[in-house]
Amino acid sequence: MIKYQKLTENELDTFIKMRIQQLREEGATEDIDLVPALHDYYSRHMADGTFVSWLAMDGDRIVGTSGMSFVEKPPYFGCPNGRIGLLSSMFTDPDYRRMGIAKELLSRVINEARDYGCGTVQITASDMGVLLYTDFGFVKNNNFMHYKLQQT
């Protein structure tokens, strides 16, 4: 039976391995070791309350992950308080897919964003995740753009 719990430091190493597995599945190019940066990010933001994750557990095994980062930007009409949830780290072990785990994890982190006071939640969805998010009620925003900064 699948049980759900919040991520703690105890599960962080496995959570990071699953995050990297997710990025690989999505076709990311591995040109650096992300483990130290991920560990630093999650540790700092879990401690200050600006990152939360729910896990799906089969016994002691993590079989699904989710993540919500909380950011604030100047208020705008679509989000008058400026608080935004950034959804990430949505991953389900391939052996556990199509069992409703991702939907349950999504619901739990959406509730976390609501409790934090976010006016909107954003995600850059993988091709595999689009149906989950649209079924949940997410809508595409064709205005989203990004610019990659070169580090000097």
PLM regions: where:
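Conserved acetyl-CoA pyrophosphate-binding loop and the N-cap/start of the following alpha-helix
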Residues: 96, 100-108
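A short helix-loop-beta-strand connector motif used in the catalytic cores of GNAT acetyltransferases and
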Residues: 43-55, 86
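Conserved GNAT acetyl-CoA-binding A-motif
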Residues: 106, 113-125
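Conserved acetyl-CoA binding element of GNAT-fold acetyltransferases
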Residues: 78-94, 143-146
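Conserved beta-strand in the GNAT
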Residues: 55, 61-70, 86, 91
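Conserved GNAT-fold acetyl-CoA-binding loop/helix
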Residues: 20-42, 82
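Conserved beta-strand-loop-alpha-helix junction that forms the acyl-donor binding cleft
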Residues: 121-131, 146-151
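A short beta-loop-alpha structural element at the N-terminal edge
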Residues: 3-17
